[in-house]
């Protein structure tokens, strides 16, 4: 073998290739390219160009200028690149319900038709004509701006068919033939003459009539204004056909269906547009562009400060963890909001940073300059009370809230009883003998205690306005209602005529025999004495008398 090194040919290892001839770039008017992208009508876009609101390659655009593929266009803070259409046109049929507007963004927050449409990549839906918020029916949308402009332009005379329900003018039962004739010939509206190319009565009732109408223009609310010019009121309006495309019967409201590609090609041929994919420019959004970051202003004791809240990163997931710490919690000190003594808000730190902050921020000194609060009050702060003892209830050293002297013979009146002057209770008999145990009624109306009978717990039942506490049962002290009655029957009966109850009738009511209302010195009543009351009077009823049945 020869030791001579082999020389490699550089031509064989070259990665260069013969470049193909560059295709000529498309060039179109700027307002046409913007309309092709669905950013508005050509007339409105021309006005925006004249106002200097659009830039091309960093310079303010001029009216009538052209752009080529690859140019950068800025509009409303967004950046686009002009590029040729490579996909075929698509057309969508949407059955619009009431309550939706045909705009991309509504300042009043109403729902739009674009919220219910399929999502596109690299293009956008363009509405072919508009329907107001109360009009329903067929709405066509396309990705081809040239097709949309041709179908909307009056020079192409594309038919729009509507079904309308009309109320006759006031004082008339139905829409007259004279009104139909005038609308067929044409009437003068605010923006010029208008007419129905076709009008046909298709039904009606006693209150309204149904018509089928056809127009070849797309003015704002043209169908409604034509009927209103004759004094009629439109109560229902639905579009059923646009050109050769009709609304499918099976398509529900709020739903959409895409038109077959062969029908789209036929529609373009009918409008005398070129076949295949349209050789036109459109706008593609710049990938990865950042919108203006939203910010908020925090007003604190030190003044105003801006804070980053939520920037649009066009799908950058790695920024989520960083955005979590954008909103900082403010740790307030003892001074509170708006007080000069409080600590400043910020992050909670520890370690060396906390040590440095403690050296920079000494403790607050008390004194006249800082507003000396004075010495603390003497005594136990817990001894200050924010409640008051009700009248008639005493407090004592015992654990019960109503602690006080208890036992026989206290003779304390019921705090919830109605106090009044003592007097005689009307009745027919003499005084009843003293009860067993010896309690009697004094002149003041209060019940006394004697050594023979203990206090009752609730002799009159629990009053409606009296508080009841669990401790009243757990630790009984003084009870304003009396002590509990001893268990068992009392020793001995109640002396008096007729056994335990008086013989007289005890029907309640003023003037009743043996009864009567309370009152001092009632007629026929004996004066009440200690330990007795008139027989048969008061609240006691004799057996077999009064309201008790035999």
Swiss-Prot record:
SUPFAM superfamilies assigned to the protein according to its UniProt record, in alphabetical order: Alpha-L RNA-binding motif (SSF55174), Pseudouridine synthase (SSF55120)
Superkingdom of origin: Bacteria
Any Gene Ontology biological process: enzyme-directed rRNA pseudouridine synthesis
Comp. bias intervals (Basic and acidic residues): 317-334
Domain S4 RNA-binding: 28-97
Transmembrane intervals: none
Catalytic activity: uridine(2605) in 23S rRNA = pseudouridine(2605) in 23S rRNA
Cross-referenced PROSITE patterns: PSI_RSU, S4
EC number(s) recorded for this UniProt protein: 5.4.99.22
GO molecular function: 23S rRNA pseudouridine(2605) synthase activity; RNA binding
Coiled coil: none
Disulfide bonds: none
Pfam families linked to this entry: PseudoU_synth_2 (PF00849), S4 (PF01479)
Function: Responsible for synthesis of pseudouridine from uracil-2605 in 23S ribosomal RNA.
Family assignment from sequence similarity: Belongs to the pseudouridine synthase RsuA family.
UniProt name for this protein: Ribosomal large subunit pseudouridine synthase B
Organism: Xanthomonas axonopodis pv. citri (strain 306)
Lineage: Bacteria, Pseudomonadati, Pseudomonadota, Gammaproteobacteria, Lysobacterales
């Amino acid at each position: 073998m020869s030791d001579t090194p082999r020389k490699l040919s550089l031509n064989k290892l070259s990665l260069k290739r013969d470049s193909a001839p560059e295709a000529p770039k498309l060039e179109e008017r700027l307002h046409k390219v913007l309309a092709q992208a669905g950013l508005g009508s050509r007339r409105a876009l021309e006005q925006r160009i004249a106002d200097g609101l659009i830039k091309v390659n960093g310079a303010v655009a001029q009216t009538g200028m052209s752009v080529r593929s690859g140019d950068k266009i800025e509009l409303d803070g967004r950046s686009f690149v002009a590029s040729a259409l490579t996909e075929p046109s698509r057309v969508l049929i949407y059955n619009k319900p009431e309550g939706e507007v045909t705009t991309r963004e509504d300042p009043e927050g109403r729902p739009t038709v674009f919220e219910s449409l399929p999502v596109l990549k690299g293009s956008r839906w363009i509405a072919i004509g508009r329907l107001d918020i109360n009009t329903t029916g067929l709405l066509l949308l396309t990705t081809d701006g040239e097709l949309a402009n041709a179908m909307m332009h009056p020079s192409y005379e594309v038919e729009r068919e509507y079904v309308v329900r009309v109320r006759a003018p006031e004082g008339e039962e139905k829409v007259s033939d004279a009104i139909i004739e005038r609308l067929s010939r044409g009437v003068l509206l605010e923006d010029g003459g208008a007419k129905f190319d076709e009008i046909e009565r298709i039904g009606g009732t006693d209150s309204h009539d149904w018509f089928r109408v056809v127009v070849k223009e797309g003015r704002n609310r043209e169908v409604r204004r034509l009927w209103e010019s004759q004094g009629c009121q439109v109560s229902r309006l639905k579009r059923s056909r646009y050109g050769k495309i009709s609304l499918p019967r099976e398509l529900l409201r709020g739903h959409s269906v895409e038109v077959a590609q062969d029908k789209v090609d036929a529609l373009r041929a009918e409008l005398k547009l070129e076949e295949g994919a349209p050789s036109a420019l459109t706008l593609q959004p710049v990938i990865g562009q950042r919108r203006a970051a939203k910010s908020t202003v925090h007003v604190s004791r030190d003044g105003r400060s801006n804070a980053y809240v939520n920037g649009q990163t066009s799908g950058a997931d790695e920024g989520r963890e960083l955005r979590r710490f954008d909103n900082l919690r403010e740790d307030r000190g003892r001074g509170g909001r708006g007080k000069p003594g409080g600590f400043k808000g910020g992050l909670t730190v520890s370690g060396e940073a906390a040590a440095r902050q403690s050296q920079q921020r000494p403790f607050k000194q008390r004194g006249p300059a800082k507003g000396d609060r004075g010495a603390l009050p003497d005594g136990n702060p817990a001894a200050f009370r924010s409640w008051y003892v009700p009248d008639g209830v005493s407090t004592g050293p015992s654990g019960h809230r109503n602690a006080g002297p208890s036992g026989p013979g206290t003779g304390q009146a019921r705090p919830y009883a109605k106090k009044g002057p003592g007097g005689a209770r009307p009745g027919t008999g003499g005084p009843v003998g003293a009860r067993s145990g010896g309690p009697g009624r004094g002149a003041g109306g209060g019940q006394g205690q004697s050594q023979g009978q203990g206090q009752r717990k609730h002799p009159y039942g629990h009053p409606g306005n009296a508080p009841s506490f669990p401790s009243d049962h757990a630790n009984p002290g003084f009870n304003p209602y009396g002590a509990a009655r001893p268990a068992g029957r009392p020793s001995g009966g109640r002396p008096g005529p007729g056994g335990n109850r008086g013989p007289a009738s005890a029907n309640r009511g003023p003037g009743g025999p043996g009864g009567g209302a309370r009152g001092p010195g009632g007629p026929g009543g004996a004066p009440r004495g200690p330990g007795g009351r008139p027989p048969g009077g008061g609240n006691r009823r004799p057996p077999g008398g009064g309201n008790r049945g035999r």
